[in-house]
Amino acid sequence: MLSSRWWPSSWGILGLGPRSPPRGSQLCALYAFTYTGADGQQVSLAEGDRFLLLRKTNSDWWLARRLEAPSTSRPIFVPAAYMIEESIPSQSPTTVIPGQLLWTPGPKLFHGSLEELSQALPSRAQASSEQPPPLPRKMCRSVSTDNLSPSLLKPFQEGPSGRSLSQEDLPSEASASTAGPQPLMSEPPVYCNLVDLRRCPRSPPPGPACPLLQRLDAWEQHLDPNSGRCFYINSLTGCKSWKPPRRSRSETNPGSMEGTQTLKRNNDVLQPQAKGFRSDTGTPEPLDPQGSLSLSQRTSQLDPPALQAPRPLPQLLDDPHEVEKSGLLNMTKIAQGGRKLRKNWGPSWVVLTGNSLVFYREPPPTAPSSGWGPAGSRPESSVDLRGAALAHGRHLSSRRNVLHIRTIPGHEFLLQSDHETELRAWHRALRTVIERLVRWVEARREAPTGRDQGSGDRENPLELRLSGSGPAELSAGEDEEEESELVSKPLLRLSSRRSSIRGPEGTEQNRVRNKLKRLIAKRPPLQSLQERGLLRDQVFGCQLESLCQREGDTVPSFLRLCIAAVDKRGLDVDGIYRVSGNLAVVQKLRFLVDRERAVTSDGRYVFPEQPGQEGRLDLDSTEWDDIHVVTGALKLFLRELPQPLVPPLLLPHFRAALALSESEQCLSQIQELIGSMPKPNHDTLRYLLEHLCRVIAHSDKNRMTPHNLGIVFGPTLFRPEQETSDPAAHALYPGQLVQLMLTNFTSLFP
């Protein structure tokens, strides 16, 4: 591709290397320019200012002094690209030295492209002309070689095959083949990118009163009648720009560029091959119907006051996802990788976009600029909705208007809103996105097995079969179809791409990929395994109602084992339930009790050797001789319950009953509230309080009074569903309630 700048190699060939400026050379500013010097002073140049050229420091900056300034004033640096050099008319032309390629002093010409150079070449052949031709006002898009001088056409000799000539090679070829002294110009021309200088805007674009030429999405193209240039206006934002709007993703071939200029040469000048030339990149360059070669040149665009610099290749930008819905909801996470978590409700700004549900900690300002979230904030977490299951969470929370989201990795979230219409809108939006993702996955599975254009070897995560309900049972025909699809779209990238395509190693790796992807596609979700009884839920962190239903009792068996061990050898221990046990041993006991699995910190599953080991667990063995380990495991079991033993919905009523002045009325209301609790909660609470009454009977030895036991078990039994801002205020009345129940146990539990 030709370039519009002459590089130092071309300067050396043409004899135009860096040299001192001719005496009496003047500069005229083409455009206004302002910069800050090294000493911190600001230098401003206005259009039409004239300077006396002192020295051409480099190709970008020249040292000059203003004409009206005294000779003792300090010179300044001016941008060479913004200046035009002029000479004093009193200069006389110099003689031509035979055998050398020199020009006589004279006004310098600025050639912004190869076309302007070709237009200026005929003036060289006239020895008598001392004044150069005027600068062309407009560039031609295409110049035929009929208008070029014969001296320029001489270097191109006919031959069996032509070769591509760059803009740097063109003047060198012309000068190398010139025989004898040539009539020269009065001053060597200076080549710079005049096209880029002309494209630099001197003023902002005019208003939209100009005629509309074209509409592209929200951008309108108009023509400025004064300058003859096109400008663009965004009809939505009102933004005006001289530059055309950039697309976020370009599908054009990099070889075909905008703003190309063509130089046509006749068949007698260049003899191209029958099927076209081959460029440096290895792709054949097209020929026009007359057989002439087309040389393309991409014009670069400068933003003033930046100077010419190489621009990187355009990158493909991902299209921004459209925001489906956003709003303020109450959110809590109840499961992480299949492990139950304690509820922690809190407000969150939720954004539904693409295939993700993004959560922000803080709500946006009153008028957010976009639906993505608060400006300058980072998302707290996100949920991948591919294969997710959406349902109402009435059975998971006592709150109203709750949505339950379960994902493939085993993460579960609850979304709640005080307004039913708002939650219905979220339910419709989430269901629409999930169904669209399911249809997309099914369409991809039924599509042809060919690799998509432009995707390369990149694996799309949506190629996996993400199903949130039921095991994926594939027939033999489906296996064969899936295997053919997996061969063309491998799941894992093992070693390199070349080894996976060619040779026996690549075949083996493809076979491994196919097996792995078939295994993942057939792997049933966790919910289906639990429904079929293959995987049973844990003991710690399990719903009390489901645990009792599975065990066929109203009191969990692990709670019975712990209370029996404490009744046997712990009632006389000083500080029972007040002293903490060894946490490592407590976790070991918990691991043995859990029926399903233990989840490590990095998300891996550790399965016990045999499920259901709590049935054969002996807490009287020497391994559990420390009674504080047993009591610590009992308290941990109560804390890990997803719902506290006393339902959070009854907490305000318990607190109101406690505030009554009459004791009989207070006990009557508390008894009614206890009777309204579910059967597993009621029986478990009674079994626990009955055991604590036996502990109080030995308070002379263990020093555990009703007040001390209320401090230990109050925050656990009467835990609120949402954390309060003042924990001290909440920790007061639960202990009083437990103390009241222990003191009046016989009247509350007849």
Curated annotation (Swiss-Prot):
A region including the PH domain and partially overlapping with the Rho-GAP domain mediates interaction with phosphoinositides. Residues 22-88 form the SH3 domain. Residues 342-345, 397-399, 432-669 are annotated as: Lipid binding. Residues 476-485 have a biased composition (Acidic residues). Residues 213-247 form the WW domain. GTPase activator for the Rho-type GTPases by converting them to an inactive GDP-bound state. Has a substantial GAP activity toward CDC42 and RAC1 and less toward RHOA. Has a role in regulating adhesion of hematopoietic cells to the extracellular matrix. Binds phosphoinositides, and has the highest affinity for phosphatidylinositol 3,4,5-trisphosphate, followed by phosphatidylinositol 3,4-bisphosphate and phosphatidylinositol 4,5-bisphosphate. This is Rho GTPase-activating protein 9. GO terms for biological process: regulation of small GTPase mediated signal transduction; small GTPase-mediated signal transduction. Residues 542-749 form the Rho-GAP domain. One of its GO terms (cellular component) is extracellular region. The keyword Ribonucleoprotein does not apply. Residues 446-462 have a biased composition (Basic and acidic residues). Keywords: GTPase activation, Lipid-binding, Phosphoprotein, SH3 domain. Residues 301-317 have a biased composition (Low complexity). Interacts with FASLG. InterPro entries: ARHGAP9_SH3, PH-like_dom_sf, PH_domain, Rho-GAP, Rho_GTPase_activation_prot, RhoGAP_dom, SH3-like_dom_sf, SH3_domain. It comes from Homo sapiens. The modification Phosphoserine is found at S475, S500. SMART domains: PH, RhoGAP. Residues 163-180, 251-270, 291-300 have a biased composition (Polar residues). It holds the Pfam family RhoGAP. Coiled coil: none annotated. Transmembrane segments: none annotated.
